[in-house]
Amino acid sequence: QYEPSSGGRMMNSHYGTRSLDPLGQWKNLTSQINSSSDISPTASQMPRLLGLAFASKLFRNNKALDAFTHFSNNGDEVAFGTIGNASTSEGHFFEIMNAAGILQIPMVLAVWDDGYGISVPNTIHTIKESISKVMKGFQREKGTNGIEILVARGWNYPEMSAAFEKAT
């Protein structure tokens, strides 16, 4: 009522690490914790997440990049990302997950599924009401590429910690 443009759904807490110093020069990204900020359109963080993970793989496999030590620790980085369950209904979510499985990149994605997408129940935005069930065809099998799918209850800290440990 008071904010008709978005119905109060403006996500205004998108924070990120500054990668440039005040003079516009690159900082040493390997000596700081780096966070890439989300952007408002749903699932739009997915292409960036893929790019960060693929960059890590390139730094690991391309010796021509060895001189750029301020960007990577020899490609040992893992790109972590998060997405809400309703945003997994966006097409680029599936495109990125397919590319991640093909490229075999160091990427961990947490899907926060509380049964709703902003205010819409899973029954009307996700087939089978579970993105992990939908993604079963992407599951890596012995001798193939693909992705690992781990399921943990977000409110169970030891279970979540174990899942993240296994993922990395």
Protein language model features and the residues they cover:
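Cofactor-binding active-site loop characterized by glycine-rich and histidine/acidic residues
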Residues: 1-103, 110, 121-139, 144
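Short gly/pro/ser/thr-enriched loop/turn and capping motifs at secondary-structure boundaries
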Residues: 115-118
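Short hydrophobic alpha-helical runs that function as membrane-insertion/retention elements
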Residues: 106-111, 148-151
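Structural signature of the thiamine diphosphate
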Residues: 156-168
